[in-house]
């Protein structure tokens, strides 16, 4: 593993001196060409040629053939095919992968390129490795060592240098357009770069027969989350067709025949095959009764399999490991966890659409249990804080090994996913929905108590690190995370959704303190913060195209190559690096205030995501306002598909450069169960404001 470059050169010289019938530089040039190639298919072709070189002895020929076969599989097999050889072994076994190439072989530096990538993506993908400082450091250091050997042997290999921290610019920066607001120019370029990355995946990875992208169904199904600004915000036929192809294929697999996974797994993995396919299907095909009925069916599983009455007479999940037919019996898995709401996202959307009373009563009975547990101070949990888990069957707010905030003991499988605050805004969104559907104030109690604790923390920042599990610790972790596009922490996202839907000013003080990346404000300071966040995001998106595309080996981590370059091993905020803010783009263009896994979009712009920018500034149930800028030189025809306005009559108005412009038809009629479409013409290169409000 630690063969020096000098030893490799000595071995190369030995091969060259033994060459018969070829010029001495022929073998050398082939090895150099293979090592310096930045395209793996090109490398495969060169190795195929090298393998037929008549001067190679049997040993070197076998090594070349073995390496060529590995590279072929890298190009043509599943993205993590190499895991099969290390399955059942310690995580570090990936570092000893047998390429069939000796340590002193001149081909060894090429193997180091693949060893480094396997180590890097294992670190990026594996949460148990990533959150263990000792293991994370070993993986990072070993990967870097491999890439350094590659860079030393093959200085033209830009892929290895990218992993070592060299930023590789890609694409072009659009020319400035006079009159375009800064936010619009920044957003436009990011939308177009995101679309280019998505189209790369469709063109180069999507399989014609199944729609898969090579990372396995369980990882591929999560890709739509970072597609959301383009996929859900606009209308790109190629991208929409690709998503529909994948999701329709995914939900017809045998293990989902009954409507949910037939094999028991933890909820994050058991639910993703339904949630991460049904939700985009329900959004993209809203008139399909098939998907709505399937969403309603989640309520049947909840009633018949997943939940029961605990010893307090309350409804709760009996475990966070379950399938379509049973829950896990193990005591260490007998917890109702925050993330269990992930299995119910399709049901929540179906309830919101249909108002089904039976399903609503069931969901509310479960949420009542969480409201009650939040109010209690129990097992060290502060009153007013949602617990990480509720133990079955006694209904206590409790976790593993006496820690209320840890349903999984440290070092256990998926520990970092389930530890508090986990995906807390997914359950606070469910509480918000329950309030808007029923009008009951009780569902706001957890939001109010945690908002007060978060506000108290911001006003009185502790001088020392808070004790885990304490109120101060909770107040700190309720912060939205700048660099992690997830629902971990970030209570503010739910509060922003609630404000948008109801117009309440109750949480304004807290919302104002959390920053415009998460709460879009239209005042001067808010716009400056928003533009600063967009600049950071664009800086990350302008470099390292391979890190978003060809280098990715875990399709649920397409936006996370930068994680490998972080300066420490915590990865909470990716110290020293910035991740593209794809959720910010989604919030800007759709008017939603949170992540798309439980989408609450105000609008879809029925036009391609090119030469355009959109900023929704108001998106309540009765009013809508958006700023738009079209960068093209000719007027643009499009429609706004309005998704959040409650039934009624509305009037639309358009202003261009502050002056009213007459619409061909300014009437908007919203009927129950249907989305209205407003067609209009967007003028070229002028700031336009679209406003929709109730008819007097």
Tell where the protein language model's regions lie, with residue ranges:
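Catalytic domains of carbohydrate-active enzymes that cleave complex glycans
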Residues: 26-633
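N-terminal secretory signal peptides that target proteins for export/translocation
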Residues: 1-6
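Boundary at the C-terminal end of the N-terminal hydrophobic targeting segment
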Residues: 21-23
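C-terminal beta-strand-rich structural cap/linker in extracellular carbohydrate-active enzymes
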Residues: 667-696
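Surface-exposed beta-strand/loop patches in extracellular or lumenal glycoproteins
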Residues: 631-648
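Surface-exposed loop/edge segments in extracytoplasmic proteins
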Residues: 659-666
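Bacterial N-terminal signal peptides
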Residues: 10-19
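Beta-strand signatures of extracellular beta-sandwich domains
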Residues: 651-653
């Amino acid at each position: 593993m630690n063969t020096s470059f000098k030893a490799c050169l000595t071995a190369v010289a030995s091969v060259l001196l033994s060459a018969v019938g070829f010029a001495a530089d022929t073998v050398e040039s082939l090895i150099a060409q293979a090592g310096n190639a930045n395209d793996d298919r090109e490398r495969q072709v060169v190795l195929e040629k090298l393998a037929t070189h008549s001067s190679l002895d049997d040993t070197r020929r076998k090594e070349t053939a073995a390496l060529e076969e590995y590279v072929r599989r890298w190009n043509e097999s599943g993205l993590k095919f190499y895991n099969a050889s290390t399955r059942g072994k310690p995580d570090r076994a990936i570092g000893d992968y047998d390429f069939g190439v000796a340590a002193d072989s001149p081909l060894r530096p090429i193997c180091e390129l693949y060893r480094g990538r396997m180590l890097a993506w294992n670190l990026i993908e594996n949460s148990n490795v990533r959150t263990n400082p000792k293991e994370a450091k070993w993986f990072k250091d070993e990967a870097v060592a491999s890439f350094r050997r590659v860079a030393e042997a093959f200085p033209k290999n830009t892929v290895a240098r990218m992993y070592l921290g060299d930023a590789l610019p890609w694409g072009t920066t659009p020319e400035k357009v006079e009159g375009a607001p800064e936010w619009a120019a920044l957003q436009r370029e990011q939308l177009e770069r995101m679309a280019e990355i998505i189209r790369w995946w469709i063109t180069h990875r999507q399989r014609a027969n199944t729609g898969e992208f090579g990372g396995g169904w369980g990882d591929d199904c999560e890709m739509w989350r970072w597609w959301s600004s383009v996929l859900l915000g606009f209308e790109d036929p190629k991208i929409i067709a690709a998503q529909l192809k994948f999701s329709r294929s995914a939900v017809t697999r045998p293990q989902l025949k009954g409507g949910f996974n037939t094999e028991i797994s933890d909820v994050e993995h058991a639910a993703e095959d339904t949630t991460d396919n049904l939700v985009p299907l329900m959004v993209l095909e809203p008139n399909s009764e098939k998907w709505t009925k399937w969403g309603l069916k989640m309520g049947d599983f909840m009633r018949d399999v997943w939940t029961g009455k605990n010893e307090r007479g309350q409804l709760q999940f009996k475990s966070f490991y379950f399938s379509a037919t049973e829950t896990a019996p193990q005591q260490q898995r007998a917890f109702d966890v925050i993330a269990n709401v992930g299995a119910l996202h399709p049901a929540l959307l179906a309830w919101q659409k249909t108002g089904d009373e039976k399903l609503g009563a069931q969901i509310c009975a479960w949420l009542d249990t969480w409201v009650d547990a939040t109010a209690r101070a129990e097992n060290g949990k502060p009153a007013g804080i949602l617990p990480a888990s509720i133990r079955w069957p006694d209904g206590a707010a409790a976790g593993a090994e006496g820690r209320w905030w840890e349903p999984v003991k440290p070092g256990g499988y998926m520990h970092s996913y389930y530890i508090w605050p986990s995906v807390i805004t997914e359950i606070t969104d469910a509480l918000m929905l329950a309030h808007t559907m029923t009008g009951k104030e009780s569902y706001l109690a957890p939001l109010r108590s945690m908002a007060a604790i978060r506000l108290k923390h911001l006003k009185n920042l502790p001088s020392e690190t808070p004790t885990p599990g304490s109120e101060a610790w909770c107040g700190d972790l309720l912060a939205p995370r700048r660099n992690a596009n997830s629902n971990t922490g970030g209570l503010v996202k739910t509060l922003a959704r609630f404000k948008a839907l109801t117009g309440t000013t109750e949480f304004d003080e807290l919302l104002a303190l959390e920053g415009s990346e998460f709460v879009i404000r239209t005042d001067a300071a808010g716009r400056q913060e928003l533009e600063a966040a967009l600049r950071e995001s664009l800086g990350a998106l302008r470099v390292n195209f391979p890190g978003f595309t060809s280098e990715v080996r875990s399709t649920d981590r397409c936006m996370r190559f930068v994680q490998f370059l972080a300066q420490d091993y915590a990865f909470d905020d990716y110290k020293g690096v910035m991740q593209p803010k794809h959720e910010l783009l989604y919030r800007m263009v759709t008017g939603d205030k949170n992540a798309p896994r439980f989408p609450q979009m105000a609008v879809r712009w029925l036009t391609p995501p090119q030469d355009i920018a959109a900023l929704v500034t108001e998106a309540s149930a009765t009013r809508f306002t958006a700023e738009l800028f079209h960068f093209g030189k000719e007027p643009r025809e499009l429609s706004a598909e309005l998704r959040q306005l409650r039934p009624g009559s509305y009037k639309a108005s358009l202003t261009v450069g502050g002056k009213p412009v007459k619409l061909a038809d300014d009437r908007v009629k919203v009927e129950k169960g249907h989305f209205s479409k407003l067609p209009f013409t967007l003028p070229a290169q002028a700031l336009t404001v679209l406003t929709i409000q109730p008819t007097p």
